Each structure stands twice: as C-alpha cells, then as structure tokens.
Amino acid sequence: KLSSKKSDAFRVDHIGFLFQQFNLIPYLNLIEHVLLPCRFSKLRYQNAGNTESSLKDEACRLLNLLGLEPDKFSHLATQKLSVGQQQRVAAARALIGNPKLILADEPTSALDPENRLAFLRLIFRECLKNQTTLIMVSHDTSLSAQFDQVINLGVLYRVNEP
C-alpha cells in the first residue's frame, strides 16, 4: 500500500484529470494553467520538455491544437473565456507531460455538437501518440460509437446486484 504522499506523487505523475467543472484557478493565465501538473510532477515536467522555454512551447502546441491561440487569449482572465474555451484549457492541462492515464468526466458537455467530435478526435490523437489510456464518463450515448470499449454502468450495477 502506498503512503498518502506516494499516492499523491503517483497520481500527479501518471494521471491527467479533465474535470466536468474544469477547476481553473482565476489568477493563472492560460499557459500557467496548462503547466500546472508540471509544477507538481518532475516526471511530467521532463516529459513536457524539461526546460522552461520548451515547457511553454509544449503548452502553446497543445493550446493551438485545441483551437486556442495563446497570443490571442493569454491576456484574458479565465473567467472571461467561454465555457468551451475553459474546457479546452483544462484538456491541455490534462494532456501535458504525457500521463499514462486520463480520467475525463463529461469532457464534451460544454461543447456544441460540431465541436464535440473534433475535440474528441484531438484528444484521441494525442492519447494514441503518447500511449495514454483515456477513461471517459459521459451521459451522451451518441459518443459511444467513437470508443473501442463502452461500459454501461446501469447494466454493470444490475449484474452486481445480489
């Protein structure tokens, strides 16, 4: 069993989180948000570039990939971004440093149908490139066709009933 400290270190080193509510910190800019996991994890810091300038380049690459030009948006407070833009900042934060697992809770809920599939394809492409496993929770059953494996928790619960 891991100690609390080692458990925290394992989580930050190996798991990227994409929360439904984004959990963006109001006083951080876009780049600072994306780089946050690298401030807590030496492994993700090394994977993302290992120098401040290469870290910033990787953060900018992810933001650009997700349709947020850092030069255009970096001056805005996170509260001034649209909900969809905030969600993309949170996605870049989850992806930085190549975690082995990304846990995503309703990551497409704030996106319109046009952007939903494009967003997922970008996440899938980055996960495939970095050999990252994506576990996503969603109530949107129309997205199930995009995944290799789908588990219906309602069915799962019934199977486990005594």
Where in the sequence are the language-model features?
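Short coil-to-helix segment of the ABC ATPase nucleotide-binding domain corresponding to the Q-loop/switch region
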Residues: 28-37
